[in-house]
Amino acid sequence: MKVLFIADPMASFKTYKDTTYAMMREMAKRGWRLFHTLSGELSVKNGLVVADASAFEFLGAQDDHDKNWFAAADKVQTALKAFDAVIMRTDPPFDMQYLYATQLLTLAEQQGAKVFNSGQAMRDFNEKLAILNFSRFTAPTLVTTRSADVRAFLKEHGDIIIKPLDGMGGMGIFRLTEKDPNIGSILETLMQLDSRTIMAQRYIPEIVHGDKRILIIGGEVVPYALARIPQNGETRGNLAAGGRGVAQELSERDREIAETLAPELKRRGILLAGLDVIGSNLTEVNVTSPTGFQEIMKQKGFDVAAMFADAVAEWSVR
């Protein structure tokens, strides 16, 4: 198989924990031909969606800081439909450039490319707003552009979390209580004087035990979750915010949530998704670049990357 990864520069990968690296390593073991491009290197020429793609040989990292784990050839402009699979792994934020990239990916799919996750799925399934489709699994939630609404929500619940709809890695997330002296300045900053839509949720105290990332691949639930434990004094468990990842078996509630969402995600053409769960509450559905493969493999011995590669092979011929 020929597989194109649309991802951040490979020299920037933290190979000891990077999920895209784990995907590439597994596919290289299978003898698949691997290519890399940046989202900014997508374009349309003579009606075809093309990428400045470089074939690369997977050499493997010798230590955690090895930047020479690959050997890349010169870039060649290649139509996306020439690959057996195109894997979109560019991190958010989901800004206008990201939106344009998904639109080009949708056009490429119309031309015969197999893209995972599909451009339409990434556009339609906002990672924060997606939980509103499954409200029986969520804590009380507000979506608004009005700071007055947030103040009323805070008065009702006493302790809330507010966050932007386009962030990642815990960026822009604040915890507010009624006694917080900085409510006004936080709302002004995050909501940009009532011009930016945000989400507010009742604070879930179980966050002190971490939030859990539950992976769904090809409509099947990975049997282990990655609990992300916040640092002392933090309310964010995100690994990018300094959280510590601990792999653990799914609880009955975890499995109920995941098995309810899995068929809907599959129906929408979402090959890989990461559900974020705090306590018994679904808080996010990540469809852009879910992580956690390496931590689960190292701690539990379950080969998530192999499960993913199997799904790519199956879905690419559908």
From Swiss-Prot:
Keyword Translocase assigned:
no
Q: Check the record and name the HAMAP family matching this protein.
A: GSH_S
Q: Which reaction does it catalyse?
A: gamma-L-glutamyl-L-cysteine + glycine + ATP = glutathione + ADP + phosphate + H(+)
**Annotated PANTHER family:** GLUTATHIONE SYNTHETASE, RIBOSOMAL PROTEIN S6 MODIFICATION PROTEIN
User: Which cofactor does this sequence's record say it needs?
Assistant: Mg(2+); Mn(2+)
Positions with a binding annotation for Mg(2+): E284, N286
In terms of InterPro entries, this protein maps to: ATP-grasp, ATP_grasp_subdomain_1, Glut_synth_pro, GSHS_ATP-bd, GSHS_N, PreATP-grasp_dom_sf
Q: What is the name attached to this protein's record?
A: Glutathione synthetase
Question: How does the cofactor attach, per the note?
Answer: Binds 1 Mg(2+) or Mn(2+) ion per subunit.
What's the EC number here? 6.3.2.3
- Record-stated family: Belongs to the prokaryotic GSH synthase family.
State the GO CC annotations: cytoplasm
Q: In which pathway does it act?
A: Sulfur metabolism; glutathione biosynthesis; glutathione from L-cysteine and L-glutamate: step 2/2
Q: Which organism is it from?
A: Neisseria meningitidis serogroup A / serotype 4A (strain DSM 15465 / Z2491)
Keyword check for Manganese: yes
Where, in this chain's numbering, is ATP bound? 154-210
Q: Which Gene3D superfamilies match?
A: 3.40.50.20, ATP-grasp fold, A domain (3.30.1490.20), ATP-grasp fold, B domain (3.30.470.20)
Which segments constitute the ATP-grasp domain? 128-313
User: Which UniProt key words apply to this protein?
Assistant: ATP-binding, Glutathione biosynthesis, Ligase, Magnesium, Manganese, Metal-binding, Nucleotide-binding
Q: Which GO terms describe its molecular function?
A: ATP binding; glutathione synthase activity; metal ion binding
